[in-house]
Amino acid sequence: MDRVPVPGNPGETRWNNRYCQVETTYWNIADTVVDPERVKEERERLRLERNARDRKRYAEKKAAEQARREKEQERIAAIERLNTYVKKCWAVSAEPIKNETGIVSVAVETTGLDGYDELLRVAAVDGDERLLIDVMIKPRYVDYWRDAYEVNQISRADVADAPYLADVAAKIKGILLSGHVIAYNSWFTEAYLDVPGVEIDGVKEHIDGYTGLAEISEQYGIPYSSVNTVDKAIATLRVYKIIST
């Protein structure tokens, strides 16, 4: 129909419907006139607007895709950089310490759960619950771990003057080489203590694979603290002894 609105009549703008919230302007037939030339001009204007809108959406989509690719590339680069650093740290020469119990129960705290996260604290006790190490570690690359802080309560200030992993790797490695290493969550702990020649026995896997240390400790009446890494290592050892008898 070759009709257009009467000049100066704005019409009524409203949503198409609740599911397609796009504004459309409507006019009563009485508010329009027959004008083929103006209809042609209006159709051309709408076509140009639609094309411009489509080009803008396409450009925004491409920009978003590029941003995602760049972010993923940065993530991969961060993981590779950290892996190179950690591998170099654990390659250090170390002799096993004297450990007559033959057991090392270890617990760790980290900046998170992703491949680019780092150690914040390592604690270990021997089979008689004697402390072998309890050390804070300053992350080499990660400088923000708000989500992890809610769990482990280790702040940036807590590790500001702490040694880097490279400074304590030899000591940690010597301890881990001194006996049968156990941790409650082996897959998690191994990701951060990936020391050549060291295999970590997961206590959790000997139970059911999903019960947490806090829950199992309560079940057996074992003292437990979610923010004390040494307590976690001791609790892990006690659970291990119970399920091993």
Description of each model-found segment:
Residues 32-102:
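N-terminal accessory regions of nucleic-acid-interacting proteins
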Residues 85-198, 216-224:
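Conserved non-catalytic scaffold segment of RNase H-like nuclease domains
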